[in-house]
Amino acid sequence: MTTYTNGNYTQPKTLDKDEQLAGLAVTLANAAAFPMILKSAFELKILDIFSKAGEGVFVSTSEIASQIGAKNPNAPVLLDRMLRLLASHSVLTCKLQKGEGGSQRVYGPAPLCNYLASNDGQGSLGPLLVLHHDKVMMESWFHLNDYILEGGVPFKRAHGMIQFDYTGTDERFNHVFNQGMAHHTILVMKKLLDNYNGFNDVKVLVDVGGNIGVNVSMIVAKHTHIKGINYDLPHVIADAPSYPGVEHVGGNMFESIPQADAIFMKWVLHDWSDEHCVKILNKCYESLAKGGKIILVESLIPVIPEDNLESHMVFSLDCHTLVHNQGGKERSKEDFEALASKTGFSTVDVICCAYDTWVMELYKK
């Protein structure tokens, strides 16, 4: 049921199936608007204004324009057009407020806003949104058709090299990439550390492909008996801060991995083809002592896609790996078991879930 008007939005109208389907098609055709508006709201720190204002507080677009330092006299009107879209997606709330000049829309934070605001570095999906919609990443999508018809990874078609090489040539994008990974990691790791008890017997832990070290730093902060090693490409760890109990080591996981009794990998295997994953897991096997384990943190795809949140999340992520990575893909539990069987590891044990990711253990036989 949708409410339509002759100006006052009070007359109910029930959409028939044809109108509902057409409306959905129109929404899909216009879908680019929402993430780009949301990206701007994050980058302009508008979401932070709402998040810090708190539940039940409403702010006018004139106040927001002032707080973000807008010099454009039309900014309040432009912001209203942006924010009403965000309110329609439950990122914000909205109500009419009467004033001397008549009624105006004012906005406040909805619960979803707190997951997208910067949260003073305490975990956010906002930087991941910015990464996925950065101009460097977006260019890949324009090569998808050619990839399907002719081959050639879209990111490499767009930029002449694979993503992980490109980050070493573009300092700005390298920072955007690292921030997207780091802030998503904080959010996921908080939940993971509450739900997963598999670090208690670990003495030396290597985070393979650990980016700037957020994963292992949070693990070591809670499990202080662990010696943590953050292992990634040299240009990646060059951007890494110092953490107590963590050593940053530069290298290539396809060539060697530091010795450890446990290896942690979050969102690493999904970036690579099965052949590449076998090479990575073989290097992990060489690194681990007998009985050592890999702690994998990855999404798990359902067998049949459905119109639900789980399918939307994992299949969207899968298509990101499709265009940006060389053979990258999301996998099922059976897919991970097939990789494990080729590399000498035991059956994959699925332990627990942390937001959109699953924690799995693979033991060296």
Curated annotation (Swiss-Prot):
PROSITE patterns: SAM_OMT_II. Pathway: Polyol metabolism; myo-inositol metabolism. S-adenosyl-L-methionine binds at D232. GO terms for molecular function: inositol 4-methyltransferase activity; O-methyltransferase activity; protein dimerization activity. Pfam families: Dimerisation (PF08100), Methyltransf_2 (PF00891). Catalyzes the methylation of myo-inositol into ononitol (1D-4-O-methyl myo-inositol), the first step in the biosynthesis of the cyclic sugar pinitol which has osmoprotective properties. One of its GO terms (biological process) is methylation. This is Inositol 4-methyltransferase. It comes from Mesembryanthemum crystallinum (Common ice plant). SUPFAM superfamilies: S-adenosyl-L-methionine-dependent methyltransferases (SSF53335), Winged helix' DNA-binding domain (SSF46785). Leaves and roots. The levels found in the leaves are 25 times greater than in the roots. Its EC number is 2.1.1.129. Induction: By salt (osmotic) stress. The lineage of its organism: Eukaryota, Viridiplantae, Streptophyta, Embryophyta, Tracheophyta. Belongs to the class I-like SAM-binding methyltransferase superfamily. Cation-independent O-methyltransferase family. Signal peptide: none annotated. Keywords: Methyltransferase, S-adenosyl-L-methionine, Stress response, Transferase. The active site is at H270. InterPro entries: COMT-like (IPR016461), O_MeTrfase_dom (IPR001077), Plant_O-MeTrfase_dimerisation (IPR012967), SAM-dependent_MTases_sf (IPR029063), WH-like_DNA-bd_sf (IPR036388), WH_DNA-bd_sf (IPR036390). It is an enzyme of class 2 (transferase). It catalyses: myo-inositol + S-adenosyl-L-methionine = 1D-4-O-methyl-myo-inositol + S-adenosyl-L-homocysteine + H(+). The gene is IMT1.
